[in-house]
Amino acid sequence: MQIHSLKYPLIELKGVNVTFAQKTILSDINLTIYPNSIMTIVGPNGGGKSTLLKVLLKLLPATSGKVIYSKNVVIGYVPQNIYLDKSLPITVEKFLSLRKGTHKQDIKDALTLLSIGHLRLNAMQKLSGGEMQRVLLARAILNKPNLLVLDEPTQGVDITGQAELYQLIKQTQQQLNCAILMVSHDLHLVMADTNEVLCVNQHICCAGSPEAVSNDPVFIRFFGNQFAKNIAFYTHHHNHKHNIHGDICCGQDFRSTQCKHKIN
């Protein structure tokens, strides 16, 4: 019996395909998101990562296949970025209050949790990249989600702030007791806490623990041998592993498939 056979999935994708104008964007995607897990999606630009998130968020219908949601799943979403009209200044508090059913205390609590209470009355247009991402994260947790979906959460954040932001995301996950699904190229920063990595290029090319994926030939062809070695080094020095459900377990890999794509 698997360690977490009693945990019910938050979301399951079964044989999901997405096509536009007879062009395949996603092919035969199968994945399961469990409570309290952290799953990171990597892959080349144009490989379908953002499309996969849109399907999960019900922003785009799958051409075929099934997307099954737990009846109690509550999703918070952090996009890569948002467009704000500079001619219409708006404070952080006003921006967050645009979410239906939000109360001032909810806003204060979210900002306090993310250590940005001092930004409450600041203009959104004057925020730095890191501050903006924290505000978007605050907006995502207003509905107290049990699944946070993050699309390149360090977009627009300088290098020194990226590790700090990922640490804040991890702390938020622990506070909310939620799962995280994120698209990220910063695997060297998130790998210690990631339970499963999915490498997506139209289909799932390889998947498993960060250490397992870093040794997969497909991953190495995508990201380079030195980058893969760095990931393997970091994971080797992490003092334990987690399975995809978030539990400490003995060394084991999950799944790895041979990618049909050729990479020049």
Swiss-Prot record:
Annotated positions binding ATP: 43-50
Cellular component per GO, a single term: plasma membrane
InterPro entries the record matches: AAA+_ATPase (IPR003593), ABC_transporter-like_ATP-bd (IPR003439), ABC_transporter-like_CS (IPR017871), Metal_Ion_Import_ABC (IPR050153), P-loop_NTPase (IPR027417)
Major subcellular site: membrane
SUPFAM superfamilies referenced in this protein's UniProt entry, alphabetically: P-loop containing nucleoside triphosphate hydrolases
A Gene Ontology molecular function term of the record: ATP binding
Membrane-related topology note: Peripheral membrane protein
Domain of life assignment: Bacteria
Enzyme class: translocase
Reactions it catalyzes: Zn(2+)(out) + ATP(in) + H2O(in) = Zn(2+)(in) + ADP(in) + phosphate(in) + H(+)(in)
Domain annotation ABC transporter: ranges: 11-226
Listed GO biological process terms: response to zinc ion
EC number(s) stated in the UniProt entry for this protein: 7.2.2.20
Keywords, alphabetical: ATP-binding, Cell inner membrane, Cell membrane, Ion transport, Membrane, Nucleotide-binding, Translocase, Transport, Zinc, Zinc transport
Compartments it resides in: Cell inner membrane
Similarity annotation: Belongs to the ABC transporter superfamily. Zinc importer (TC 3.A.1.15.5) family.
Subunit structure: The complex is composed of two ATP-binding proteins (ZnuC), two transmembrane proteins (ZnuB) and a solute-binding protein (ZnuA).
Function: Part of the ABC transporter complex ZnuABC involved in zinc import. Responsible for energy coupling to the transport system.
Protein name (record): Zinc import ATP-binding protein ZnuC
Organism: Histophilus somni (strain 129Pt) (Haemophilus somnus)
Source lineage: Bacteria, Pseudomonadati, Pseudomonadota, Gammaproteobacteria, Pasteurellales
